């Protein structure tokens, strides 16, 4: 057994409009556990990330997050019920079964970060 044990890994997600993005993620279902003017720690259960008041278009346009959930359709219903796509003028598409054994949907946050929210399914 290695002595190099790990606890978790977190991404620093860029935000073009820090306050707007913080609200977006709260509407999506994340809680703000801690926040300053330049950084916020957000989590949902055991999943977390750091939202940073930092924006470079090339970074944001190529940044992706993947959230694995137990019920992707429940998450999609939540996104629709809260009107998140229209409220934030973002792109979001309904869940689809993928050939690699996942059912997921995509949404793009107000900064341009692509999120894939999905659940594992059995491959045909």
Q: Predicted segment positions?
A:
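N-terminal beta-strand motif that seeds the catalytic metal site of vicinal oxygen chelate
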Residues: 1-19, 65, 118-124
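Short glycine-enriched loop/turn motifs at secondary-structure junctions
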Residues: 4-7, 57-62, 99
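Core segments of cupin and vicinal oxygen chelate
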Residues: 5-8, 12-49
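Conserved beta-strand segments that form the floor/walls of ligand-binding pockets within enzyme
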Residues: 8, 14, 50, 94, ...
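Short, flexible helix/strand-to-coil boundary loops that buttress conserved ligand/catalytic motifs
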Residues: 25, 55, 79-80
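Conserved short beta-strand elements that form part of the metal-binding/catalytic scaffold
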Residues: 31-69, 114-119
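Acetyl-CoA-dependent GNAT
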Residues: 56, 92, 98, 119-123
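Vicinal oxygen chelate
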Residues: 65-114
